[in-house]
């Protein structure tokens, strides 16, 4: 598999206190700053962006290597950590001392919601004084509000929605509301839990607010399953009109709409135990085909093309489902196998200076940022970083680049002090990145 390397990005910032955090208030516009002026700054080294292109033609045969089971050895944050980002970017610790922070959502009032999924808690945070550190922190919802491994969060139709592992719930919401009330109304029942980490359920509102898109991962590695497993479907905000958008997606997690085209995209964790080089995770658009049928992306019968048959799903040397195998769509951007691609967000198109803060250079506008949580099913560890996938004219170019790296200490272990999960572009043009292992949120900003 050929890999070329390109990197771009990261800044982070953090705040902890033994005293109760102040209530969230309206944020002041942040002022542009040199990285040396930023509070909670993380030391950085310059990373030179280089394209990484994984193609179907480069893939090895199944079982070309052993399938290792090497989960990471997660260590504490170093006393003097150093992260690598492209020139001109700075990193701060935006928030610290968190319990397994996973997913992020921007509330209508500008505050940031954080799903600490394993704690069945959603926090509400904000950088009220605009210095790049979230000093305001309060509890927005807990298990008492019906949370059960919450992840995706969305706002639509004057309401707040959360994706639990077993359902999607709707709650009354008013901008600026500091805490959810009640246990909400279930608008979609879902199959709960799943294989390894496949309990995550993302929920995102369409740009027009008329639909909610929901992701559901598989329950197994490669066993055939009934929908809605391994699919993305959509419903109206009141739960009606369920329609499968795409399926054969082993574990779709990240979900976002391109800012220029409105096309939905998802990140997918592909299957295990075929060797180090199979199967690449990916970023792809989703939707209906020319016949109005949901697109099929291969799982569990094929991978990436109709010709790549999974050897575990054969019958007499042929695919168990030749009808579906023939429909397999090739994804837009392939990632190195076992990277564990999770969080996804697009940088706005036509972004300019916002509130006096320098936004990212034009080459990032309309492109996708993806968090790689990192491998467990590979001899040499991979992932543990944030990548950037360039787009041109609203379409993926086909390669990706490293944007924020430095967490992975030793790939042979692997040993790491960071497992990025969620990403969120803020109105000021900076990027937030959740790091689950050591309980931080990093902020990446462009300081020129």
Give, region by region, the residue ranges found by the protein language model.
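C-terminal motif of bacterial Sec signal peptides marking the signal peptidase cleavage site
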Residues: 10-12
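Bacterial signal peptide processing site
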Residues: 14-17
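Beta-propeller domain segments
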Residues: 37-86, 218-220, 230, 235-240, ...
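A short beta-strand motif characteristic of beta-propeller blades
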Residues: 91-96, 137-143, 185-193, 241-246, ...
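Beta-rich, blade/repeat-based domains predominating
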Residues: 97-109, 143-159, 163, 193-211, ...
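Residue position within the beta-strands of beta-propeller blades
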Residues: 113-115, 162-163, 213-215, 265-268, ...
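Acidic carboxylate motifs that coordinate Ca2+ or other divalent cations, activating on Asp/Glu
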Residues: 131
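Asp-box/WD-like beta-propeller blade repeats and closely related beta-sheet repeat scaffolds
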Residues: 136-154, 165-207, 215-218, 241
């Amino acid at each position: 598999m050929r890999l070329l390397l390109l990197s771009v990005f990261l800044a982070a910032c953090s705040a902890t206190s033994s005293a109760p955090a102040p209530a969230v208030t309206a944020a002041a516009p942040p002022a542009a700053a040199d990285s040396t002026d930023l509070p909670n700054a993380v030391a950085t080294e310059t990373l030179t962006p280089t394209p990484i292109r994984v193609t179907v033609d480069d893939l090895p045969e199944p079982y070309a290597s052993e399938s290792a089971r090497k989960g990471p050895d997660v260590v504490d944050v170093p006393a003097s950590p150093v992260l690598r980002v492209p020139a001109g970017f700075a990193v701060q610790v935006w928030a610290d001392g968190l319990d397994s922070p996973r997913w992020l959502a921007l509330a209508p009032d500008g505050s940031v919601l954080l799903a600490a999924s394993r704690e069945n808690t959603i926090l509400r945070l904000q950088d009220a004084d605009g210095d790049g550190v979230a000093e305001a922190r309060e509890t927005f919802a807990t298990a008492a509000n019906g949370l059960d491994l919450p992840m995706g969060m969305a706002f639509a139709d004057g309401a707040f929605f959360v994706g639990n592992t077993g359902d999607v719930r709707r709650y009354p919401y008013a901008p600026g509301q500091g805490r959810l009330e009640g246990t909400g109304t279930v608008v979609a029942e879902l199959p709960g839990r799943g294989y390894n980490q496949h309990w995550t359920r993302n929920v995102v509102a369409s740009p027009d607010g008329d639909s909610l898109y929901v992701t559901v991962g598989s329950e197994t590695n490669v066993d055939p399953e009934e929908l809605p497993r391994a699919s993305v479907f959509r419903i109206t905000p009141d739960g009606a009109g369920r329609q499968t958008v795409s399926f054969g997606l082993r574990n779709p997690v990240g979900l976002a709409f391109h800012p220029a085209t409105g096309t939905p995209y998802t990140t997918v964790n592909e299957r295990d135990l075929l060797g180090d080089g199979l199967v690449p995770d990916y970023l792809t658009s989703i939707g209906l085909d020319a016949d109005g049928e949901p697109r099929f992306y291969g799982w569990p019968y094929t991978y990436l093309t109709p010709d790549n048959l999974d050897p575990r799903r054969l019958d007499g040397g042929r695919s168990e489902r030749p009808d579906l195998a023939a429909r397999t769509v090739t994804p837009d951007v392939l990632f190195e196998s076992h990277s564990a691609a999770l969080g996804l967000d697009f940088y706005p198109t036509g972004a300019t200076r916002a509130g006096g803060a320098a936004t990212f250079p034009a080459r990032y506008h309309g492109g996708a940022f993806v968090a790689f949580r990192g491998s467990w099913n590979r001899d040499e560890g991979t992932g543990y970083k944030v990548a950037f996938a360039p787009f041109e004219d609203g379409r993926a170019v086909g390669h990706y680049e490293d944007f924020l790296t430095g967490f992975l200490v030793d790939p042979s272990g692997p040993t790491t002090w960071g497992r990025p999960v969620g990403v969120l572009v803020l109105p000021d043009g900076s990027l937030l990145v959740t790091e689950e292992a050591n309980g931080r949120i990093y902020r990446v900003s462009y300081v020129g």
